[in-house]
């Protein structure tokens, strides 16, 4: 029988101090830092398109899109960094965490699917302000949208394709899915 040894848990504030000094990309599982890997060029293109589309539509609305560097506190002091989010609450420029995200976006990578679809869905479900969780595929132009009317409601799932528009009534915006994938080069389908 083998036993995995784990360092003693650290606090969220210790995590932020450590991560600042380290300079790498890390999430916090509520006990220990968890390394985040870099993404592909397609991942970067999708994130850039997402950020530009949201910023254009939300300018002057009172809601603000934020990128990958601001965290969300989830279950048990865990800190998650997603690819984008929208908040309608003004957040201090020096803050590490966004207190009231409304829409959260994750762009899948070859290794993040399980975490993004299962673990983060559960954790984001514990954040009362989140009304929509949008998961963008990286290998095709498919989008999974999970939405709920309130914090105590179950998620409702919908699948979108490049011909659809992502409607986000909670922030008064909609974006054609094809816009997220502009310039993205997909590998040819296997025959």
Question: Regions from the language model: what does each represent?
Answer:
Residues 1-191:
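Gly/Pro/Ser/Thr-rich low-complexity, intrinsically disordered segments predominantly at protein N-termini
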């Amino acid at each position: 029988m083998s036993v995995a040894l784990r360092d003693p848990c650290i606090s969220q504030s210790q995590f932020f101090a450590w991560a600042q000094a380290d300079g790498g990309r890390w999430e916090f599982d509520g006990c220990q830092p968890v390394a985040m890997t870099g993404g592909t060029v397609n991942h970067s293109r999708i994130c850039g398109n997402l950020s530009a589309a949201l910023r254009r539509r939300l300018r002057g609305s009172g809601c603000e899109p934020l990128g990958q560097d601001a965290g969300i506190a989830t279950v048990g002091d865990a800190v998650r960094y997603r690819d984008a989010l929208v908040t309608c609450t003004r957040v201090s420029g020096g803050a590490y965490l966004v207190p009231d995200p409304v829409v959260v976006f994750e762009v899948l990578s070859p290794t993040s699917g399980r975490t993004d679809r299962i673990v983060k869905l559960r954790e984001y479900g514990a954040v009362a302000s989140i009304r929509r969780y949008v998961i963008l595929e990286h290998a095709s132009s498919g989008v999974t949208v999970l939405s709920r009317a309130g914090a105590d409601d179950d998620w409702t799932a919908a699948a979108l394709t490049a011909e659809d528009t992502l409607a986000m009534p909670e922030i008064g915006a909609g974006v054609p899915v094809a816009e997220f994938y502009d310039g993205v080069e997909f590998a040819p389908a296997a025959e």
